[in-house]
A protein has these predicted regions:
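Active-site-adjacent substrate/metal-binding segments within catalytic domains
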Residues: 2-147, 162, 190, 221-222
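Extracellular glycoside hydrolase catalytic/binding regions
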Residues: 144-227
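Short, positively charged
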Residues: 1-2, 202
Length: 227
């Protein structure tokens, strides 16, 4: 007997050159916000496909061309993004704790990375892989983890970018700076969750922004959350 599988795929290339992001060789700005599937208060994590698609449509109507998912999603989500031109960063669900990941976390992350690439690499909407979100970006252990996982994703899938999303890029004094550079600088794109004037830097916004720009100099900088 024979077996057949049918799926949609597309061809595109997202690359980095200096501080520019290029889509098929042309400079582009990644504009958007994160979205957490399962956020609908009426459905919770049992969110049906039509509700997920309604939220994705809202992103398109807000002129977003990019979003990120904190954890892996069903193929149906990516099929919608494929069809509607919404670029995605799919992330390993490593968020906040532990602040400095060790070897056990790294082993689990590598297992999940392998499964993510195997399951979703045919989706052109996925342009980046994410190795984590909001750890202690100034910790040497976090930096080592990010460098290892970015290299691991590149080994699995050389065609895509790999990044870490930081909430500490602007923390010049708030956390001990074991590392000279924030961990996000070891990904392809410098990704920063920006809460200036709300959660931090209420009294010295200008100083914080100057520090961020100095840190990110020479790399693309994308705001991945804001508030």
């Amino acid at each position: 007997g024979t077996s057949r599988s049918k799926f949609r795929f597309g061809v595109r290339e997202l690359t980095v050159r200096g501080d520019q992001i290029l889509l098929n060789g042309k400079e582009i700005r990644l504009l958007g916000m994160e979205w957490m599937p399962g956020s609908c208060p009426d459905c919770g994590m049992a969110e049906p496909q039509e509700v997920s698609e309604q939220f994705l449509q809202l992103l398109k109507e807000a002129n977003c061309n990019f979003t990120r998912f904190h954890w892996q999603q069903d193929n149906a989500i990516y099929e919608w993004c494929d069809a509607h031109g919404l670029m995605v960063q799919e992330e390993i669900p490593l968020w906040g704790k532990p602040k400095a990941p060790g070897k056990r976390i790294e082993q689990t992350a590598k297992q999940q990375a392998t499964e993510m690439v195997a399951a979703h690499s045919n989706h052109p909407s996925i342009v980046c892989w994410g190795v984590g979100n909001e750890l202690n970006g100034h910790s040497k252990r976090t930096v080592a983890y990010v460098r290892e996982m970015v290299a691991f994703f590149k080994q699995l899938d050389p065609s895509r970018l790999a990044n870490y999303v930081s909430s500490t890029l602007d923390y010049k004094k708030r956390t001990p700076m074991e590392s000279e550079h924030d961990a996000t600088l070891y990904g392809d794109i410098c990704m920063w969750n920006e809460y200036m004037g709300t959660w931090n830097h209420r009294d010295h916004y200008d100083e914080g922004m100057r520090f961020v720009c100095d840190q990110a100099k020479g790399k693309p900088l994308v705001i991945t959350e804001f508030g």
